[in-house]
Structures are given as structure tokens and as C-alpha cells.
A protein has these predicted regions:
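Short catalytic/metal-binding and nucleic-acid-binding patches
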Residues: 1-324
Length: 324
């Protein structure tokens, strides 16, 4: 039986989560249909655009994403403190980007002085609900999946499920796990042979970051790295230059069929993480196989299980072997 979401997500322990949504029956609903010949590749752009829009409205940052032909990967960061700093008006305006609000909210947003004291109390009550939702991964994924499903069904002139009923989520508990899952996501299209380089890996965060880098711009919709010039938000705990070198070395090693990466120069990120080249290669190639639940060092996994009241501690042996 699937675990309830409160046993999978706990922002008091970690703000980072890896989420996966798969198309029903693992059908390829975002590429060329082999039976009809119809190309649905444009749906990947729908998903990417929706992710960007959601990241603008939610107190949730996009660390990494990859839109595949029959599933999506996203690595998310919950910026809980950011949501708490929004005014009531900001919360209502952000929620209205996606849903039609009650008449009292619509009237208030059209004329901020046209409400009674009772209506103002109702607005404050609604803003509390909306604020909580705007920092919820469940609502983030719901607004992503529901929108894409409706649009795809309209295009196909049919009804029914587009996605599997529940998305999978993994708590990412430390820097080793975070760097590993981001690399796993960014390299996924190349390993699936739907791209050949990081630059032509379409509808991925790494391509978006590289395009921004070439234009000397900051990726607008993504969580910045620590070496970014954009300092208005909490950055990822490592530099993009080090991360890019590491995943490039990883990719080159795989192409040469090496058992571990052999960079020309020592990689600062790998040294900072304290991981061996062999363990890095293994974890970033088999992340979902090695870890089916929360990911991190054994101590962090034990703490997460205790805080979330989970009796089972899956994959502790793998964490001990590869991430300790």
C-alpha cells in the first residue's frame, strides 16, 4: 500500500525532493505514436512551460528537470520562508494565476478598498489556505499533471487518465544525494538515447542553463547555483562550473565504457562531496534502482524515518555503501 504523503515529505528535515510522474501504462504519450504516426513531441514543451510558470508562482524552486517521452523527473526545493514573507495580496494574486477565485477575492483584487470587515476576515482565511498550497509539492505536481492531462485529452478528443494516479517522491537528505540526483536527471535523456549531448538534450534544465550561460544570462526559472550572480534567493550548495565539469566527465566516461570517471583535472565538487569516482558513477547511473525512498547518509535516513514516523528504513545498506 502506498505511503501517505506526510510520511514522504517533511520540510523540517529537508527542503529537497525528487519527483517522478509517469504516463499511464508507461505509454509514450509525448513522442511519435508508432501506431498512428502522429507526433506528440510538442507536449514536452507544454510540460516545460508549465514547470516554469509554476516555479514563478510557487515558493518552490526548480533545481533540475527532464521531460522524457513517457515520464518526467523534477528535483524541487521548498522555500518555506519565502512563502511566509508574502503579503495577503501577493498570495491571492499568485493563486489567481491558476484558479478562478471566489467572488470576494475577485472583487477585492479589482478594487482593494471595496470589502467589508467580514469579507476581509474571509480573505485572510482564504490566503492562509492558498499560502499553504503554494508551498506544497502535492499541489505543485497536481497543477502540473492536471493541466497537461486536460490539454492532451482535448487534443486527442478523448477522456481518461494521462498520468498514473500518484507521483513518486523521494526526500533528498544531503549534498551527496542532491548532486547525485541532479546529475541522474540531467543525464537521463542521453542515457535513454533521445539526446546525444547536454546541449541538444531538449526540455531539460541542463540545456536551459547552458543556453542561458551562452547568452550570459541567469536562468530565469531555475534555482541558481552558488556561483550565480543572482543572489536574491538561497542558491544550490555548489558551483555550476564544478557541477558542469563533473557531469561532463561522467558522460565522457560512459561513452568510453570506463568503470569510473577519469577527469584531466581533479574535480572540486567530487572532492567536496567526499565520494569516490566509482561510487559517483554507480549512483548517478542507477539512482532509482539503488534508492526507492529517501536518499542520504544512513544517519540522515534514520532521522527522516523517525521524524516521519516510518517503521521501514529502505536502502540503508546502499546508503552505507555509497553515500556514507
Amino acid at each position: 500500500m502506498p505511503l501517505p504523503r506526510y510520511k514522504q515529505i517533511n520540510t523540517d528535515v529537508t527542503p529537497y525532493y525528487h519527483c517522478i510522474s509517469r504516463c499511464v501504462r508507461q505509454s509514450y504519450l509525448c513522442c511519435r505514436d508508432a501506431r498512428t504516426g502522429i507526433n506528440y513531441e510538442h507536449r514536452r514543451k507544454w510540460i516545460q512551460d508549465r514547470l516554469h510558470k509554476l516555479s514563478q508562482a510557487f515558493a518552490i524552486d526548480l533545481c533540475a528537470y527532464a521531460v522524457m517521452h513517457n515520464h518526467i523527473h523534477v528535483v524541487l526545493h521548498i522555500a518555506k520562508g519565502r512563502a511566509e514573507g508574502w503579503t495577503m495580496d501577493e498570495v491571492l494574486l499568485r493563486w489567481r494565476m491558476f484558479y478562478k477565485c471566489p467572488p470576494v477575492v475577485q472583487r477585492y483584487l479589482e478594487n482593494f478598498d471595496s470589502v467589508t470587515l467580514d469579507e476581509l476576515a474571509e480573505l485572510k482565511s482564504l490566503s492562509v489556505i492558498y499560502r499553504e498550497r503554494l508551498q506544497s509539492i502535492s499541489w505543485f505536481m497536481r497543477m502540473l499533471n492536471e493541466y497537461i492531462a486536460r490539454r492532451a485529452n482535448k487534443e486527442d478528443e478523448c477522456k481518461g487518465y494521462f498520468w498514473e494516479r500518484r507521483f513518486k517522491s523521494q526526500a533528498i537528505l544531503d549534498e551527496k544525494a542532491l548532486a547525485s540526483v541532479m546529475a541522474y536527471v540531467d543525464l537521463n535523456p542521453i542515457r535513454a538515447k533521445i539526446a546525444t549531448t547536454l546541449g541538444n538534450s531538449h526540455h531539460t534544465s541542463i540545456q536551459y542553463r547552458l543556453n542561458a550561460k551562452r547568452s550570459n544570462k541567469t536562468p530565469k526559472f531555475l534555482m541558481p547555483f552558488s556561483d550565480s550572480h543572482y543572489k536574491s534567493t538561497v542558491p544550490l550548495p555548489f558551483a555550476f562550473s564544478d557541477y558542469l565539469q563533473l557531469i561532463t566527465d561522467t558522460l565522457n566516461a560512459e561513452r568510453n565504457n570506463d568503470t569510473c570517471i577519469t577527469p584531466k583535472l581533479p574535480n572540486r565538487l567530487l572532492s567536496k562531496l567526499g565520494m569516490t569516482k566509482e561510487n559517483w558513477q554507480l549512483v548517478t547511473s542507477n539512482f532509482e534502482t539503488l534508492f526507492t525512498g529517501p536518499v542520504g547518509c544512513p544517519e540522515m535516513m534514520e532521522n527522516f524515518a523517525r521524524c516521519c514516523q516510518r517503521a521501514c528504513r529502505p536502502n540503508v545498506a546502499n546508503a552505507q555503501r555509497y553515500l556514507s
